Amino acid sequence: MMAVEQMPKKDWYSILGADPSANISDLKQKYQKLILMYHPDKQSTDVPAGTVEECVQKFIEIDQAWKILGNEETKREYDLQRCEDDLRNVGPVDAQVYLEEMSWNEGDHSFYLSCRCGGKYSVSKDEAEEVSLISCDTCSLIIELLHYN
């Protein structure tokens, strides 16, 4: 399995023509439709060589997109990476905070920290292992989550 960090920065959802909120079933339908359309064996014999190569490349991209988005674990990793990339593009990190400095909310099993705006930064126990940036639920501030080694 390929680590998400090593994956090229492609929008696998747009390759499948899908919305990031699409469920696995919808993604599978889009994949199946596209894979049939671009499959090398389904191409007409009178198509120019350059067009055939483009179709093969598209076929490979569609297959890669499905390998990532069709698996719950790799999809989750990819979605988290997309979220972090989006946050990095929003603005600079306001503070660096160690997970151990955050408070624990037993009710929803998450760590949280109050923001200076009155909102809060929160991250679930599972996500805390994987994310490094957390946005405030009220304002645009972002913190970087650190872990003691």
Swiss-Prot record:
GO terms for molecular function: ATPase activator activity; ferrous iron binding; zinc ion binding. Zn(2+) binds at residues 115, 117, 136, 139. One of its GO terms (cellular component) is actin cytoskeleton. GO terms for biological process: chaperone-mediated protein folding; positive regulation of ATP-dependent activity; protein histidyl modification to diphthamide. It comes from the Eukaryota. It is found in: Cytoplasm, Cytoskeleton. PROSITE patterns: DNAJ_2, DPH_MB. CDD domains: DnaJ. Residues 11-82 form the J domain. Keywords: Cytoplasm, Cytoskeleton, Electron transport, Iron, Metal-binding, Transport, Zinc. Residues 93-148 form the DPH-type MB domain. Pathway: Protein modification; peptidyl-diphthamide biosynthesis. The DPH-type metal-binding (MB) domain can bind either zinc or iron ions. Belongs to the DPH4 family. Stimulates the ATPase activity of several Hsp70-type chaperones. This ability is enhanced by iron-binding. The iron-bound form is redox-active and can function as electron carrier. Plays a role in the diphthamide biosynthesis, a post-translational modification of histidine which occurs in translation elongation factor 2 (EEF2) which can be ADP-ribosylated by diphtheria toxin and by Pseudomonas exotoxin A (Eta). Monomer and homooligomer. Iron binding promotes oligomerization. This is DnaJ homolog subfamily C member 24. It comes from Homo sapiens. The gene is DNAJC24.
